Amino acid sequence: MLYKGGHNLKISPIIETDRLVLRNFKEKDIDILYSYRNNKNCSKYQRWENTSKEFLTNFIKEERLKTISNDSLQLAIAHKKNDDLVGDIFIARKEKCITIGYTVDFKHHRKGYAHEIINALISYLFDNFKGYELVALVHPDNEPSKNLLEKLNFESEGYAEKLDSIVYCLKSFKWLHGNKRKNNDDKFKFIR
């Protein structure tokens, strides 16, 4: 895996894995983003409402200006070979907590993409934000997402009624003392 940039996360690609890149959105992503953001199979566990192409065009322009240092941001998950959009990841940092969220286009479910890119993202975040805790909110009926987080050693902290979500947490010390070695056979290269 290759990491580019520091806390800025404005350089693209930010993370490369064997099959994927995590990068800023591009205008060419709008059609695929529109398609899966309006697909019931992807949106049934999400909090967004159907979105127009005009909204997504403005969204992409705004997201490209943000950094993890001072904002929440959404990044694109794309195929490494053809740069086509596969899904997206949300990252928000506050104090010593980073919240992540993710969506993979329904056409790409069950291919291991979410595990691959989130595993790399966890390593990136814990290497760059020492002592932080990662949090993910999951709809109670979203079994694939719950299974994914548990496979990555997130632990359920219980149900948050106001959010209608199960709160999953991963502490950096837990990741750095076992999970990183267990789930990640790749070598890391950091570029600053």
Name each region found by the language model.
Residues M1-K44, Q74-R192:
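Acyl-donor (CoA/ACP) binding surface of acyl/acetyltransferases
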Residues N8-L9, K61-E63:
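A generic local structural motif
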Residues N41-E62, L73:
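Conserved GNAT-fold acetyl-CoA-binding loop/helix
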Residues L65-N70:
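Short loop/turn motifs at secondary-structure junctions and domain boundaries
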